[in-house]
Amino acid sequence: MYSEWRSLHLVIQSDQGHTSVLHSYPESVGREVANAVVRPLGQALGTSSVAGSESLLKTDKEVKWTMEVICYGLTLPLDGETVKYCVDVYTDWIMALVLPKDSIPLPIIKEPNLYVQSILKHLQNLFVPRQEQGSSQIRLCLQVLRAIQKLARESSIMARETWEVLLLFLLQINDILLAPPTVQGGIAENLAEKLIGVLFEVWLLACTRCFPTPPYWKTAKEMVANWRHHPAVVEQWSKVICALTSRLLRFTYGPSFPPFKVPDEDANLIPPEMDNECIAQTWFRFLHMLSNPVDLSNPAVISSTPKFQEQFLNVSGMPQELSQYPCLKHLPQIFFRAMRGISCLVDAFLGISRPRSDSAPPTPVNRLSMPQSAAVNTTPPHNRRHRAVTVNKATMKTSTVTTAHTSKVQHQASSTSPLSSPNQTSSEPRPLPAPRRPKVNSILNLFGSWLFDAAFVHCKLHNGINRDNSMTASFIQILLSYKSSIATQASMEFRRKGSQMSTDTMVSNPVFDASEFPDNYEAGRAEACGTLCRIFCSKKTGEEILPAYLSSVILNSPPLFCCDLKGIDVVVPYFISALETILPDRELSKFKSYVNPTELRRSSINILLSLLPLPHHFGTVRSEVVLEGKFSNDDSSSYDKPITFLSLKLRLVNILIGALQTETDPNNTQMILGAMLNIVQDSALLEAIGCQMEMGGGENNLKSHSRTNSGISSASGGSTEPTTPDSERPAQALLRDYGSTDSAAGLLIRSIHLVTQRLNSQWRQDMSISLAALELLSGLAKVKVMVDSGDRKRAISSVCSYIVYQCSRPAPLHSRDLHSMIVAAFQCLCVWLTEHPDMLDEKDCLKEVLEIVELGISGSKSKNSEQEVKYKGDKEPNPASMRVKDAAEATLTCIMQLLGAFPSPSGPASPCSLVNETTLIKYSRLPTINKHSFRYFVLDNSVILAMLEQPLGNEQNDFFPSVTVLVRGMSGRLAWAQQLCLLPRGAKANQKLFVPEPRPVPKNDVGFKYSVKHRPFPEEVDKIPFVKADLSIPDLHEIVTEELEERHEKLRSGMAQQIAYEMHLEQQSEGELQKRSFPDPVTDCKPPPPAQEFQTARLFLSHFGFLSLEALKEPANSRLPPHLIALDSTIPGFFDDIGYLDLLPCRPFDTVFIFYMKPGQKTNQEILKNVESSRNVQPHFLEFLLSLGWSVDVGKHPGWTGHVSTSWSINSCDDGEGSEPDEITSSEDVGASIFNGQKKVLYYADALTEIAFVVPSPVESLTDSLESNISDQDSDSNMDLMPGILKQPPLTLELVPNHTDSLNSSQRLSPSSRMKKLPQGRPVPPLGPETRVSVVWVERYDDIENFPLSDLMTEISTGVETTANSSTSLRSTTLEKEVPVIFIHPLNTGLFRIKIQGATGKFNMVIPLVDGMIVSRRALGFLVRQTVINICRRKRLESDSYSPPHVRRKQKITDIVNKYRNKQLEPEFYTALFQEVGLKNCSS
């Protein structure tokens, strides 16, 4: 209003009219001169009034010299009569402008205006506070003020310059006394009412006789803003503005308009001679003289004035707290009084007020305020931050709201309000608004910005516009009253007696304790809300309220349906109508000039999010018609009939779909996408229940359902046409009729079609929307609803098309963010394939998916429509990036290894085999097997084969060659027990191997045996006669001598013995031959016996073709090793690295820590103790926990447990010994603390991720002996195949646990203790980035900002933060803000309100849960789990250092190859294959 005018502050500061020449002399000189000069004048003044003597001063020089002395005398202490004489003299002399007297010097009578101006400046010195004699100063100040009043009222010759000096004098003395913080019992507190009263009265007189120029109005407005911590300022302002309004209404609306009567005392403040034009100008300027009255609710603004700042530092230089100033404790009452004054003005313009008997402004009788209990029982939030509000006074149509955070002030809820009286019943009819009342828009133009801002006092704001949920029930009247008729208004009034409260009563009231005063502004808020209600209720038929105000209602009411307000559901149909007007409108042209269309749509979407669960939750419960269709434009509107909540579902769904089609803002779009998954999943769960139950019942049963905590009854799943009140129909029938339009399958199909179409058109350029759309598609894939395969194929095909488009974008557009979108698309594709593996049974779908995988790995497709087929071997790999290639490889692994194979018989906790070298060694039957009995080979630099050639001695057939292979690849550790199968399995037991067919026994009967003496010559030789020649040869005896005869005899004897011996041997041989069986095993021909010892590793590699010379050669022009290499397991550290590799998970793992927070709790110990007993928590909390995952034993669990010290272990406890503690636990009420990670955790896993849900609880400290035992057990362990953090007893091949755990259940360490006990220097894999999410169940929503997350950081340790390269100092400052928190607040309706903190990052918000959403009991667990998965996936996408699990494993395999490769020549390699392993190390 006065922006182009200059304030008079500089003029006032530079004016030295209040100083005297005596100020230049020593203080003793001035005091003596003043005492000597002023005493005769004062005494003469006392006698002159009786004797009529003239003044001692005759000339102008004498008067001016004397005035210099009096000016100094007014600054003296009040211990003497000097100051009193000075005041007496000056109050007598200023009457020269009223009625000249003889006691007044003649020069003053001649030029009264000039001298009075100087006197007024001198009198400022009197009002400077003194340290003592406060009562004397008050008496003298009142004497001056009464003289000023008389001067202004009665003077008729006062010039404009004198009026201006008089106004500046009053402004200055008010500023001197009222601007600083009030001192209790001080002069300012006693004079405040009189000071401000005189100022306003004189100002009104000046308006009549000499209207102040704009600089004076601007100066007055600025100075009054510094005095508002005095109740009298607002009180006097309220009186003046009401008196002016009473006069204004007389000539503005004529005599027929209901008069606005004010007390005569207040009416007399307005000079009778003030004309109508002057009244109007003065009224508008006085209305804004108080500045923005909403500032009165903010102590930070009130205490930011210069005088406050001067005293803001104490003597030690330390700033004081705001609560140190008692005057600020009055602000709630002052704020209420200001709002009440504005309320009276509104009532006056509406013509619905009646006069009051006291001096306060009138009390409106048409108060549509809530009963006192409604305002009192609403607990205000703790630690609310103050809010500074700035209003554009030029237009008065919109307000710019900014937030200023100051120190938090604790408070407690008060049971009574000192500003409100008990409820009273009006005994007379409530008057209707005047027929000639102004339009609603006109009143809102004047007071709207103040009232709307006052209605949100101490309500936290987000992004400057979106209000949080801290509104009390009072503001809800704005909306209730807007659609309510006056005839149906409640008869209870909420009357406040604020004006009748004395200052002493207010100060002594305990409600104004220093720690509570900022939160007692509800009375002023309620007054503003009630005023807005009356404004909206006075809308005439056919009158249109400006979009600026209607949009403000929508803009400021997103949490309206989240606050457990009784009866708020009455306005649901009307809000739906408003949303149908706003959200489908793409342009919102009629609202653009008043609000930001994006913010308006965002608020509308927030309201929609809170309305979506209502149809399913309340079902066919009818909404009672209390509005009677009074505000419907159509007389035949369905609003006149009872409607069911379920009948609103189709309208809400259509609004949701329409909003998505017209929305362009990324944040708003993501909120809608989150809502879509909410409604689809809720519908699917409801229909699943409805199909299982056939429930009949009357309306009473349905109504009772809506009031109970079940929330999952099939009755709420029914459907009824809006005009058919079939509330007694069974759920199945209702679902059947309603399913044709918005069943779960229909919603799923509509969602898939709309999202996939926009994903590949409008959204593919926007990263945040694309990620949210892909997350929605991933969530829709998990919805258990039967839909046609064509719709599922559409989703898969759209994701593939999205990947093709992103990969084909020009190279300059490729960035990390773009590749993150492609990676997210591959992850979405994996979700669809694992949830619907049968989709790959279709040839075209399989082809499309594999082409996308090929595109991701190689950078191009082998077959394009316009090109010839290019074989993969001929292509040069050129992927979009290594991250894209890694994502495509993970998809290929998912297709080849997980589809149809998950979960495995070992359970979903581990997709890997639960055996390792330690297990195989322990349960093989050969004592010679040890860790060196394994042969280690590497295939293609990516797969490590650990081969055990000795048979395990179990169900394997020992006759056949067998080999046990531990395959460690990118996808995990797999164990294969293989045998060379040479015969059909059924033939092994029935055939005798290697035994020839039996032959008949030979016949030994060969006939008669004849004894024939064989002759050397035939018998005919003896018959031949001798000739003479024959006789020439002598006989032997003739020529044998005696010597020869002896020799001959020896020879004959020897020959006889030999013949006898040979005969004996022949007979013996014949006897043995007769005794020998047939066939002779010595001479019989039979097949060779089977081999008993095999080098099965060599056979295995050879049979698979790995032992070719080409496989052993180094590739040309490449740094890669050969296709097959051997590893040397004797090198120190080999088995540690193998165990390190086994520690690397093959799936992403996430951790969720769940807390329960009862009302008023602020410390971590209080919160942790809540879960120790089920009696301390709500039953829904335990149900919610079990909906997140299933319970697993930490000691037996092979998956992620929430801490690295117990995760991914293939060891277990003995069933017999482990069951006893479980039985003891089940007999005790341990509540949710059983899932604190010591014995059990809640666990969820699918093919792509695993989550551990931990409920931290207090843990007693361990004794020193226990700590030493733990260290001893670690050091004594002989399982050196794994790193120390996983040295626990092994598991058998049959998965039969037979060993006790290393620690008893009572001795287990809490997560925080484990973090501290983890030994330094032990290898911990690089598992980051750490993905932790906290879920907090809060019974009271206002306690959210009190949640001690920083104190609980030690309880949400996973051990990942202990990895190398992590700085302790860095963790302490970054961990808290890196942990997203999901707050869940149960509403009285059985629904749940969601609050998200810290889940926004580089990629904006995460769905499906968004801030402010309302969720049903059915869908809560699913949505929380899905949100956690998406949050952690987003976090991994954001991280520059994150590598997928298969990449980390591949890198570790490469590292192992480089460190332990056995660099042998081909002959040496082949030679080693034929050598035995392990025998030389049997003793090791």
UniProtKB/Swiss-Prot annotation:
Domain of life: Eukaryota
Start-end of Low complexity biased regions: 1302-1313
Keywords in alphabetical order: GTPase activation, Phosphoprotein
Disulfide bonds: none
Phosphothreonine PTM positions: T363, T379, T724
Self-association and partners: Component of the heterodimeric RalGAP1 complex with RALGAPA1 and of the heterodimeric RalGAP2 complex with RALGAPA2. Heterodimerization is required for activity.
Stated name of the protein: Ral GTPase-activating protein subunit beta
Gene giving rise to this polypeptide: Ralgapb
